[in-house]
Amino acid sequence: MFKSLVRKSSAFQPLKYGGKYTVTLIPGDGIGRETSNAVTEIFKTANVPIEFEEIDVTGMEKNNKSSGDALHEAIQSLKRNKVGLKGILFTPFEKGGHTSFNVALRKELDIYASLVLIKNIPGFKTRHDNVDFAIIRENTEGEYSGLEHQSVPGVVESLKIITEYKSKRIAQFAFDFALQNGRKSVTCIHKANIMKLADGLFRRTFYDVANGYDAITPKDLIVDNASMQAVSRPQQFDVLVMPNLYGSILSNIGSALVGGPGVIPGANFGRDYALFEPGCRHVGLSITGRGEANPTAAILSACLMLRHLGLKDYADLINAATYSVIEEGKTLTKDLGGSASTGDFTHAILERMESL
């Protein structure tokens, strides 16, 4: 179950011509091109009323002016279209490398809320059953503020920024999501026992916001305890809200519970824009070009996008076909224990759509 939260903004008006929505497509680096191709092929076969405006952004080229220009073009495209679908862009480790293009997109457009859905796929056996929770992560501050400097040789200071305004905004998003999607509780994940000012502010603001939502139970957990609880008893979780870094870590832990990063959908929301991408944000460089990529995360993220645009019937068809192929177990990619290629898996979904 998923209901978008951006439509309540009067500023959000997706671009639509001739009965079709125009959506920005950023294939991404690594396996992004392969998984994006799977989505576009499925959309074409299903006659989904979407026209993609493709912008080829890459983070692979160090300090390349054309990469920066492409990023700017992508931002302008998203400002026009209001909705985007993207793969993950590579971020270099080296000091001289560019900052994360993924983070830059979210900050420039103030796409402040990340949503990752952690849920068992019917018929696909994992260690835990009945896992179904949402991770909501603040996208624009915390440890991802990008404010670092070397004060003296051998000493680096990295600033973690937490503000009351953005803490309140993400908490409201989490409670609104819970309310609109039939969830019962929202848990604040923090480290306020150590970071008493920063995470203390985040936790305190969370409980202030909770006072306005009588139907939802507020809880909180220290992040290390939450990580342990996630792998031991994930069924207790419903909606989790947290600063940026904790969200990155728990999203990856969550993915391992239900099949890995290849099956986790994600979305990012701001007041005016929505950007959909795989929930675990893995580039997959080690398997690029080998035809082994699992496109499920990209496909399910695209289904979230369709629901966001009000195209529920198309989303239901594609979602059902994807789940059906996985449940059948005959055509699975390598990460799910099979030997099918990305193309084989995609074509199995296309065939299943015809029979549904």
From Swiss-Prot:
Named cofactor requirement(s): Mg(2+); Mn(2+)
Keywords: Magnesium, Manganese, Metal-binding, Mitochondrion, NAD, Oxidoreductase, RNA-binding, Transit peptide, Tricarboxylic acid cycle
Annotated SUPFAM superfamilies: Isocitrate/Isopropylmalate dehydrogenase-like
InterPro entries per the UniProt record, alphabetical: IsoCit/isopropylmalate_DH_CS, Isocitrate_DH_NAD, IsoPropMal-DH-like_dom
Signal peptide, first to last residue: none
Manner of cofactor binding, per the entry note: Binds 1 Mg(2+) or Mn(2+) ion per subunit.
SMART domains assigned to the protein according to its UniProt record, in alphabetical order: Iso_dh
UniProt: Mg(2+) binding residues: 224
Protein EC: 1.1.1.41
EC category: oxidoreductase
Subcellular location: Mitochondrion
One of the record's GO cellular component terms: cytoplasm
MF GO annotations: isocitrate dehydrogenase (NAD+) activity; magnesium ion binding; NAD binding; RNA binding
Reactions catalysed according to its record: D-threo-isocitrate + NAD(+) = 2-oxoglutarate + CO2 + NADH
Record-stated family: Belongs to the isocitrate and isopropylmalate dehydrogenases family.
Chain's role: Performs an essential role in the oxidative function of the citric acid cycle. Also binds RNA; specifically to the 5'-untranslated leaders of mitochondrial mRNAs.
The protein's name: Isocitrate dehydrogenase [NAD] subunit 1, mitochondrial
Organism: Schizosaccharomyces pombe (strain 972 / ATCC 24843)
Gene that specifies this protein: idh1
